[in-house]
Structure formats: structure tokens, C-alpha cells
């Protein structure tokens, strides 16, 4: 059982977090991305009973990009993924924090070659893909009626074919979709206002 969340933005204390085998946070743990904020969230995650806990950064989590050595050290006892893989509970899990550039937030890259180079790193055969942002057309609809997901990521989904793709970033379009063999889930909690997502993989 996978328990997933994103976009808690420091508002994690009131969340009801069900039990499961793997707990995943798909980024935007904080509001301003400071080391004290990250430390507080990491401590909270360690207090939860799940045997495996995976974290990917989001665009608000600045210290993980600007001061990565100090920031990552805060996540001892947790699995922090940045364009990297871990096998937990028999699942190959890949995590990546990047999203298409938007107002110079953390982990922003230009659409096309810059961000495509990151998606090319995702290996085929992963069971669970975690990205902070959505692919184009799934969980990416914002209030102004525009789909803002990453078309390059969508193309690599067709190549990688993960069993499960978890993301957040777009608070307005939480939900679940099927794309070929892949189950796509926007697991945002929208600053702690929405419940944590619980998923069973067959």
C-alpha cells in the first residue's frame, strides 16, 4: 500500500496519514524552502510509522537546490530522490523534482531541451515514477482554464510506462487518470486542505 501526498506547504500537522508500506511526498513540503522549515517537515515524516518514506523536492523547496548538502542532511532516515532511484518494498521508484520554468522558482527548467534532458534519465522498468509537476493533459488544469503540464514528460511516460506516476504542484486538479498501462495520480493536499491519497498496486 502506497500513501502519497504533495503540496503540504508546512501545513502537515493536521493531516490524517493512514498506515501503509511506502509513504511518498511528491514535493512542496514547505512554503519558503528554508532549512528550518525542511527540518521541521523531515522530523514529522520520521515520526510516522511507515517502514519506507520517500521524498522529492518541489518548486517551493529552495534550500534543496541552493544548499543541497545541508538540506539533504536533514532527511536522514528518509529516502530523498533527485533524478535517482531506490528499490523499496519490492518496487523500483524513481524521483525527480523538475517542472517547466515558471517565475524562477526552485527546480525550474525551460521546456524542450533543458527539461527533456532530465526526463531522459528516467529508466524503463520503474514501477513508481514521482515528479513534482504533472505531464501535459493530466492533473494540470489551472483556474484560468489552461493545461500547464509538461509535454516532454508526457512523451517520456510513453517510453517508460511506469505502473504508477505520482505528482502534485497543481492544486486545482487533483485526481486519477489512466494513460495506457500507467496510473497517473495528482496527490496534492492543497496546503493540507485535501486528504492524503492511499493507493494499492495490484
Residue spans of the language-model regions?
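Charged helix-capping and loop-helix junction motifs
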Residues: 38-42, 70-78, 110-115, 144-154
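Active-site-proximal segments of metal-dependent phosphoesterases and phosphodiesterases across multiple
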Residues: 30, 35, 102-103, 125-161
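Short amphipathic alpha-helix with an adjacent loop that forms part of the alpha/beta core around
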Residues: 14-19, 87-89, 116-123, 199-201
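Active-site-proximal beta-strand elements of phosphoester/diester hydrolases
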Residues: 1-9, 26, 90-99, 127-132, ...
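Binuclear metal-dependent phosphoesterase catalytic core
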Residues: 85-89, 152-160, 164, 171-202
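Core catalytic region of metal-dependent phosphoesterases/phosphodiesterases
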Residues: 5, 10-88, 187
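Binuclear metal-dependent hydrolase catalytic cores centered on His/Asp/Glu-rich metal-binding motifs
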Residues: 91-128, 146-152
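Catalytic metal-binding/acid-base residues of hydrolase active sites
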Residues: 9, 29-30, 59-61, 97-99, ...
Amino acid at each position: 500500500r502506497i500513501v502519497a501526498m504533495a503540496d503540504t506547504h508546512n501545513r502537515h500537522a493536521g493531516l490524517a496519514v493512514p498506515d501503509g508500506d511506502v509513504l511518498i511526498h511528491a514535493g512542496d513540503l514547505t512554503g519558503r524552502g528554508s532549512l528550518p522549515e525542511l527540518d521541521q517537515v523531515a522530523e514529522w515524516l520520521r515520526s510516522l510509522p511507515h517502514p519506507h518514506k520517500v521524498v522529492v523536492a518541489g518548486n517551493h523547496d529552495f534550500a534543496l537546490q541552493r544548499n543541497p548538502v545541508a538540506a539533504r542532511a536533514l532527511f536522514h532516515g528518509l529516502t530523498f530522490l533527485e533524478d535517482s532511484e531506490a528499490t523499496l518494498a519490492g518496487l523500483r521508484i524513481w524521483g525527480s523534482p523538475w517542472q517547466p520554468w515558471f517565475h524562477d522558482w526552485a527546480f525550474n527548467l525551460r521546456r524542450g531541451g533543458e527539461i527533456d534532458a532530465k526526463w531522459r534519465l528516467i529508466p524503463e522498468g520503474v514501477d513508481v515514477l514521482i515528479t513534482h509537476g504533472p505531464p501535459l493533459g493530466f492533473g494540470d488544469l489551472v483556474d484560468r482554464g489552461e493545461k500547464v503540464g509538461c509535454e516532454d514528460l508526457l512523451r517520456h511516460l510513453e517510453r517508460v510506462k511506469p505502473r504508477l506516476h505520482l505528482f502534485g504542484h497543481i492544486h486545482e486538479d487533483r485526481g486519477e487518470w489512466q494513460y495506457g498501462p500507467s496510473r497517473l495520480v495528482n496527490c496534492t493536499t492543497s496546503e493540507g486542505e485535501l486528504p492524503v491519497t492511499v493507493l494499492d498496486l495490484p
